[in-house]
Amino acid sequence: MSNESTNPQQEPLEQVQDTEVVTDEAALVDELTQANFRIEELEQALAAAEAKVEEQKDSVVRAAAEVDNIRRRAAMDVEKANKFALEKFANELLPVLDNMERALAGTNAEDEATKAMYEGVSLTMKTLVNAVEKFGVKVVDPMGQPFNPEQHQAIGMQPNPEVPANHVMVVLQKGYELNGRLLRPAMVMVSQGGGVDTQA
């Protein structure tokens, strides 16, 4: 009998456990629903954050590219400034060189009275030309070369059977370049080629 008395007490206990399980199941379903809702919210927040990160990465890449472009432009500007800083000064020296050439052309190197002056002007001019060449100034002396309108300024054309057509036959004034940039074109006379037909 003692076994029978124990059995009735166990049945209500099992019923209570079933009730707790059912109650716990409903609570779990509720918790799972809330957890799923929270997971969806977090996934949306994560997607928004990832989109923002991609946007920021794009902005950073663009900013870095802009900084590189600015650096390149600044470096090019500095290089140009260094390369052509002497342009104005060199342009001021060109008439001095022209006058020295005229002085040499107008002086007879063989005449004893003017020989010393000729040598002095010649050495001074040579020294000045060497000095400006050190800073990138280059003489453009196109005698006998084909006419180039980018570097030469034609004063006129004359027939000359000894010089091919469209070639420089006389340099009236030399031109000058500074680091490849034309400071002043050479003033030249250009050959038309063969002589003038006088029998016509």
Swiss-Prot record:
Protein name per Swiss-Prot or TrEMBL: Protein GrpE
Role: Participates actively in the response to hyperosmotic and heat shock by preventing the aggregation of stress-denatured proteins, in association with DnaK and GrpE. It is the nucleotide exchange factor for DnaK and may function as a thermosensor. Unfolded proteins bind initially to DnaJ; upon interaction with the DnaJ-bound protein, DnaK hydrolyzes its bound ATP, resulting in the formation of a stable complex. GrpE releases ADP from DnaK; ATP binding to DnaK triggers the release of the substrate protein, thus completing the reaction cycle.
Keyword terms: Chaperone, Cytoplasm, Stress response
InterPro entries linked to this entry: GrpE, GrpE_coiled_coil, GrpE_head
Annotated S-S bridges: none
Domain of life, per lineage: Bacteria
GO function terms (MF aspect): adenyl-nucleotide exchange factor activity; protein homodimerization activity; protein-folding chaperone binding; unfolded protein binding
Location in or out of the cell: Cytoplasm
GO biological process: protein folding
Entry similarity comment: Belongs to the GrpE family.
Organism: Shewanella amazonensis (strain ATCC BAA-1098 / SB2B)
A cellular component term, taken from the record's GO annotations: cytosol
One Pfam family linked to the record: GrpE
Subunit-structure text: Homodimer.
Alphabetized NCBIfam families for the sequence: PRK14139.1, PRK14140.1, PRK14150.1
Predominant cellular place of this UniProt entry's protein: cytoplasm
